[in-house]
């Protein structure tokens, strides 16, 4: 089947926001107006189209990024609805990795909130162009210009309104288009009857002022427009739109729109802005990757004529068709029934069927083209972040960064029957979600699961119960500490066993140095002259990786360390992979004596909003919890405090804050980074590990 929409007419966008900004409702309205659904489902009634897991409908939040294809103004728009809750950050990360543009939804009463900052930072890292939709203009306390000011103050974003609201709260009845300089007035509740009128007299002066600011801001991003502007020539609407498009795609400018998705106002104009200002796959730089055969960098321009290259960004288990692999096609064409090479794993995979998804219903298609997002059935070895390519034109695309889990729980099956099922269930859930880890404690045999937060693990345990019918007892949440080395050192690992029969011999010298935070473990082979034969090098790396899983101080994984194998020796007969694995682990133990090992703990960025009179209490709470205040700002009668606090000190804080503020205080926390624990705390953790505490 020929391509239905050209690449110029394709948009791959994400909808991202803080929890409760109205993101799912906004997506829902997009589907309504693009003709994908006939009845609108309200999130607070638990009937939303995109939120298709039972847990999502119960909790009224989006957990997995559902991918949907819609059509608007002769364009295809592929939409990924991402969760706003901090515990599901990986869902946002992986959708941003495969998108070309995004719509950031704000709650107009609150403006930029903590999770908005997190997703904004991630989108900036990936260079994703964005437009901003200030939603909930019908809500009490809605303030459009305050929301715009938070984009400047909290995100340092070059954001400017291209619309202004007519009225606010109950009186919100229309939108001023600052490009056409016309007013759109809504006359019914479905947002389908819209009158275009002249701007009401009482709003004209404000509209002219903001139009002037918009023209100036756009002109600053473009030399030709700047010349016209300075010479006093009029900039036409077409030139202004082209300038906004160019600056938005270059991530130099962020257009701000307003509306109320719940009241069906402003969504169609936002869809127009998606088409007008967000990029097609042709507008963004060609994807880069490494050819695994030559180690050279290669690019894949967005074109059907190029060899096939795609990135798998999500695995889901569907109750009807089994394992679904969502992928974004960057170049080339793929037919169902054909074979591809998973270059990340070096495995050949057969594409059984190709499905295009609409929330949780699906349509089978024969062919996918460059720029498409689809799901494949039948891939056995592919996981999140893997590259799928033409077998004759290999390329490994940049993968998806997976954040380290910060919290862990012990789970134990209630019966023998549950035990067997639990292993399978946990393995399937871990395949779907790379931030969910399953480990068995070597000493106690207990199963430990770790993830990004309490809600994250709650949802997974709940899914284990519902989808896999596994009943389990769950322990109290524990912090996922990490260990690292703070000094460079060299150490020898020597293993020799010769007692009848085949002996064992492995001898290595390894230099350990601290690595940058977040870089993980890096191994370098610097052996010259074959003193350790090539076939044993992978065994040395494997031995280190395995022993780093249980650290040297308190059994926590060792992270952010570089290991350079630079010398060693072997025995013609007695050397084996096993011997070199053991030698590597002995070198690590030896290194620990002089490498200044340290325990790291997750630090959370905590944002606490309280009435003015409770500010003193909150400052006391932060100090008592080993936290440090990063900043404060007033918003109405409330104070917003931002602080870095160790996760270990935050358990039970909701209750403390509730009683201190008579239930009026709220807080949000987002994982920010790992940091050394103080010496006294480190000693406590080590004692506890040894069973002395």
Curated annotation (Swiss-Prot):
Residues 8-282 form the tr-type G domain. GO terms for biological process: ribosome disassembly. Keywords: Cytoplasm, Elongation factor, GTP-binding, Nucleotide-binding, Protein biosynthesis. Pfam families: EFG_C, EFG_III, EFG_IV, GTP_EFTU, GTP_EFTU_D2. It is found in: Cytoplasm. GO terms for cellular component: cytoplasm. The keyword Protein biosynthesis applies. InterPro entries: EFG_II, EFG_III, EFG_III/V, EFG_IV, EFG_V, EFG_V-like, EFTu-like_2, G_TR_CS. The keyword Chloroplast does not apply. Gene3D superfamilies: 3.30.230.10, 3.30.70.240, Elongation Factor G (Translational Gtpase), domain 3, P-loop containing nucleotide triphosphate hydrolases, Translation factors. Its main location: cytoplasm. CDD domains: EF-G, EFG_III, EFG_mtEFG1_IV, EFG_mtEFG_C, EFG_mtEFG_II. SUPFAM superfamilies: EF-G C-terminal domain-like (SSF54980), P-loop containing nucleoside triphosphate hydrolases (SSF52540), Ribosomal protein S5 domain 2-like (SSF54211), Translation proteins (SSF50447). One of its GO terms (molecular function) is GTPase activity. GTP binds at residues 17-24, 81-85, 135-138. SMART domains: EFG_C, EFG_IV. NCBIfam families: EF-G, PRK12740.1-3, PRK12740.1-5, small_GTP. Catalyzes the GTP-dependent ribosomal translocation step during translation elongation. During this step, the ribosome changes from the pre-translocational (PRE) to the post-translocational (POST) state as the newly formed A-site-bound peptidyl-tRNA and P-site-bound deacylated tRNA move to the P and E sites, respectively. Catalyzes the coordinated movement of the two tRNA molecules, the mRNA and conformational changes in the ribosome. PANTHER family: RIBOSOME-RELEASING FACTOR 2, MITOCHONDRIAL (PTHR43261:SF1), TRANSLATION ELONGATION FACTOR G-RELATED (PTHR43261). Belongs to the TRAFAC class translation factor GTPase superfamily. Classic translation factor GTPase family. EF-G/EF-2 subfamily. This is Elongation factor G.
């Amino acid at each position: 089947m020929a391509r239905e929409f050209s690449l110029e007419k394709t948009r791959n966008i994400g909808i991202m926001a803080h929890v409760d900004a109205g993101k799912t409702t906004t997506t829902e309205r997009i589907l309504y107006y693009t003709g994908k659904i006939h009845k609108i489902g309200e999130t607070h009634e638990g009937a939303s189209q995109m939120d298709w897991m039972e847990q999502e409908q119960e909790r009224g939040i989006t957990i997995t990024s559902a991918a949907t294809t819609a059509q608007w103004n002769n364009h295809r728009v592929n939409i990924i609805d991402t969760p706003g809750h901090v515990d599901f950050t990986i869902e946002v990360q992986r959708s941003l990795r495969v998108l070309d543009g995004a719509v950031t939804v704000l709650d107009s009463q609150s403006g930029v909130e903590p999770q908005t900052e997190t997703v904004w930072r991630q989108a900036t890292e990936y260079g994703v162009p964005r437009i901003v939709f200030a939603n909930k203009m019908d809500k009490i306390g809605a303030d459009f210009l305050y929301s715009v000011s938070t984009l400047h103050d909290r995100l340092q974003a070059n954001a400017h309104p291209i619309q202004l609201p007519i009225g606010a709260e109950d009186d919100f009845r229309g939108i001023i288009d600052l490009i056409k300089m016309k007013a759109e007035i809504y006359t019914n509740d479905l947002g389908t009857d819209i009158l275009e009128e002249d701007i009401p007299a009482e709003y004209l002066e404000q509209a002219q002022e903001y139009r002037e600011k918009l023209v100036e801001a756009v002109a600053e991003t473009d030399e030709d427009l700047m010349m016209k502007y300075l010479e006093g020539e009029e900039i036409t609407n077409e030139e202004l739109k082209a300038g906004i498009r160019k600056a938005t795609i270059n991530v130099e400018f962020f257009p701000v729109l307003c509306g109320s998705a719940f009241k069906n106002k402003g969504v169609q104009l936002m869809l127009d802005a998606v088409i007008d200002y967000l990029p097609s796959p042709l507008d963004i730089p060609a994807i880069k990757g490494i050819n695994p055969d030559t180690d050279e960098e290669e690019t894949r321009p967005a074109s059907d004529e190029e060899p096939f290259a795609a990135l798998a960004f999500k695995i889901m288990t569907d109750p009807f068709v089994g394992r679904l692999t969502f992928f974004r096609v960057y170049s080339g064409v793929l037919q169902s029934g054909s074979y591809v090479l998973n270059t990340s794993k070096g495995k050949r995979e057969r594409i059984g069927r190709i499905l295009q998804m609409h929330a949780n219903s699906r349509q089978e298609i024969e062919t996918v083209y460059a720029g498409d997002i689809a799901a494949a059935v039948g891939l056995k070895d592919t996981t999140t972040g893997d590259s799928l390519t033409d077998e004759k034109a290999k390329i490994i695309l940049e993968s998806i960064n997976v954040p380290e889990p910060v919290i862990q729980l012990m789970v134990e099956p209630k019966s023998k029957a549950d035990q067997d099922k639990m292993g399978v269930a946990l393995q399937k859930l871990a395949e779907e979600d790379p931030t969910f880890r399953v480990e068995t404690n070597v000493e106690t045999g207990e199963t430990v699961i770790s993830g990004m937060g309490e809600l994250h693990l709650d949802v997974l345990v709940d899914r284990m119960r519902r989808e896999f019918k596994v009943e389990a007892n769950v322990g109290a949440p524990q912090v996922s500490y990490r260990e690292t080395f703070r000094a460079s050192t060299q150490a020898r690992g020597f293993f020799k066993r010769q007692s009848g029969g085949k002996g064992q011999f492995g001898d290595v010298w390894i230099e350990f140095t601290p690595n940058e935070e977040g870089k993980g473990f890096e191994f370098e082979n610097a052996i010259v002259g074959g003193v350790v034969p090539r076939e044993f090098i992978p065994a040395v790396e494997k031995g280190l990786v395995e022993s780093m899983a249980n650290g040297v101080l308190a059994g926590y994984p060792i992270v952010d360390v570089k290991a350079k194998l630079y010398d060693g020796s072997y025995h013609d007969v007695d050397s084996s992979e096993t011997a070199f694995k053991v030698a590597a682990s002995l070198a690590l133990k030896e290194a620990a004596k002089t490498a200044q090992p340290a325990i790291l703990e997750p630090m959370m960025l905590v944002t606490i909003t309280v009435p003015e009179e409770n500010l003193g209490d909150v400052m006391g709470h932060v100090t008592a919890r080993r936290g440090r205040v990063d900043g404060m700002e007033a918003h109405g009668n409330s104070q917003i405090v931002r602080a870095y606090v160790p996760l270990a000190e935050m358990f039970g804080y909701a209750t403390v804050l509730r009683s201190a503020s008579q239930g009026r205080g709220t807080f949000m926390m987002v994982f920010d980074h790992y940091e050394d624990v103080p010496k006294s705390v480190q000693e406590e953790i080590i004692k506890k590990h040894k069973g002395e505490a």
